Amino acid sequence: SAAPDPDRIAVNVDQAKLVKLPGGIATIVVGNPLIADVTLQNGGVVVVTGKGYGATNFIALDRTGQVLVDRQIQVEGPTDQLVTVYR
């Protein structure tokens, strides 16, 4: 199997994950806010919350509009509660 992408953030639906980013971030833009919510906290920490299944990204900009971070977010269900239905 492929090695996990270190730039991809995996989070479960209705769960939150803390991610440390470089300082100087002024603005966060989320590709699809129906899939994930990204909230900037003090100290360059963002809270990534899974809202719907799928993949999106977020871009962090500094005050001049320069892109500091562009990361993929994968929102999935908890694998320990996965049910397979055979028809």
Region spans (language model):
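Sec-dependent N-terminal signal peptides of Gram-negative outer-membrane/periplasmic proteins
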Residues: 1-87
